[in-house]
Amino acid sequence: MATFKKFNKDKRPKRNTQSLLFKRKRFCRFTVAGVEEIDYKDVDTLRDFIGENGKIVPARLTGTRAIYQRQLNTAIKRARFLALVPYSDQHKI
């Protein structure tokens, strides 16, 4: 019968977790710019908040406040409906 060596976690080299993940402070671009309402016709701004695969980037990644994230969602959906912004990444403009 084979005997197994017990794995000792203490002998593993320690990693510096802060150097692996550099987190910069997120801020809301719309708050800084003083935007009151996000317009669906501003396609350049909307494209910054759409991922490579065509999905809307969540607020926890962009740092957008909840009020502006809701406006951003409706603006992107309106722009998609009017064919200003593609639904997915396969439709290139």
UniProtKB/Swiss-Prot annotation:
GO MF, one example: small ribosomal subunit rRNA binding
Subunit structure: Part of the 30S ribosomal subunit. Forms a tight heterodimer with protein bS6.
Protein origin, superkingdom: Bacteria
Similarity comment text for this entry: Belongs to the bacterial ribosomal protein bS18 family.
Protein name: Small ribosomal subunit protein bS18
SUPFAM superfamilies, alphabetized: Ribosomal protein S18
Keywords, sorted A to Z: Ribonucleoprotein, Ribosomal protein, RNA-binding, rRNA-binding
Keyword Ribonucleoprotein among UniProt keywords: yes
SS bond partners: none
Biological process annotations from GO: translation
Cellular component, GO annotation: cytosolic small ribosomal subunit
Source species of the chain: Delftia acidovorans (strain DSM 14801 / SPH-1)
UniProt xrefs under Pfam families: Ribosomal_S18
